[in-house]
Amino acid sequence: MQTPSVFMRKTAKYQIRETIITVIADEPYHPVCLDTIYRVRGELEAFIARDPYFQSTLEPYECPADAPDVVRRMCAATAKAGVGPMAAVAGTIGCMAVEAMAAAGAKYALVDNGGDIALVNDEPVVVGIYAGESPIKGLGLEIPPRDTILGVCTSSATVGPSISFGNSDAALVISDDVSLADAAATALGNRIVDVASLATAFDFLKEIPEVTGAVGIIGDKMATYGRLPKIVRAHVDYEKITKGD
């Protein structure tokens, strides 16, 4: 009887031009991830060269029939969330990388693309919630084992370089559609402008059934929406957050 191969799980940070990611997967799947990101980025860059408006618009973009898959996914997700297509770029690239690793045989694969996480996990994993200078710290979501990809995406007006029209310390959205989780997190963050807005910021998600849960944090206040994984205590190490150096 042949003994199954045993691989060492590897955590590594990579930068591919503007894409800065952390990858957690068995070591043989890391090249699969990187090859996919190079390919997908190339397709996206070629499309942007053809129509620079795609990169700059903050409104949903009408997708041409001949657009590559990465562009089609971004357009579909952001049309539902009411934001520009680049609001879904990180989640879409991360998802396509995890899809490729899973297709190659990975049972556990996670890509954190600047706070937008795509994962498939054959064991429980805790995803930390980082809300910058907010006093709400040390919390995470315990994701149970699953054999399909999940998106856990976070937008913030106070952490990182992403555009936000709100003031949230964290706007987190969960969906099986990672592109949609990314787009909806941006849209949620835009709506969290003050503590009072937490009461209504989630209302638009009622029209997006693919979103299963969300968290909004501003200052010392937190609100939740939908069905969330178990919220647990977690040590959120700032140095492990995917970001530029």
Swiss-Prot record:
Q: Which SUPFAM superfamilies match?
A: ApbE-like
Q: Which Gene3D superfamilies does the record match to this protein?
A: ApbE-like domains (3.10.520.10)
Q: Which family does it belong to?
A: Belongs to the UPF0280 family.
Protein name, per record: UPF0280 protein UNCMA_16740
